[in-house]
Amino acid sequence: MWHSFPVSAGRLALGIGGIALVVVLVLGVMQASKGSKAPPAATTLSAAEISRRLEGAPPPLAALHRQANQILPGARKGLRSRLAALRGHPAVVNIWAAWCGPCRAEMPVMQRVSVDMGKQVAFVGVDMKDNREAATTFLRKIPVTYPSYEDPSGQVYNAERLVGVPSTLFYDAEGKQTFVHQGPYFQRADLVADIRKYAHQ
């Protein structure tokens, strides 16, 4: 089950460029059956390999990569400002929290796809109703190639009328929201299919 509750309820900087150490990158090894709830297995990629895959990204996407794994202030206002800056590029916004078990299972899928498609698609996180220390610990264990906006009061969650986390919002290159997926992605193929259907140029 994913975490749900009523709608009315209310830096760790691991930048990609210049990191010499190997960072743990959890890759989703999915079960054969669609919708499997099994947690993904883990492996590692070096920072150099991540940088190689993301090298040459357009400036707005490269700016995201430079803020990899950071938790930024701003909540909904910060997210809206970033989406405006990303106009011209499709975007995927993942709403997560450290206290959310399904988010922990889904994050490796987000991480892998954000590396595979990070030169064409923008990825942004929203850390909802979380404890900062818990959130940074979460990201230390499952580092991602993009920043998350801290949203302690659940502004984005409430504005989107979501019913649980994780949830993922899709935007086309014009900045129009095209789809909302409520619930986790446990399989890479499912996330990629939705990106191609709802967000990709």
What residue ranges belong to the model's regions?
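Conserved segment of the thioredoxin-like fold in thiol-based oxidoreductases
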Residues: 65-66, 105, 115-153, 165
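Short pre-active-site segment immediately N-terminal to redox-active cysteine/selenocysteine motifs
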Residues: 89-91, 96-99, 164
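Hydrophobic beta-strand anchors of alpha/beta hydrolase catalytic cores
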Residues: 92-93, 123, 168
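Conserved redox-active cysteine motifs that mediate thiol-disulfide chemistry
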Residues: 95-112
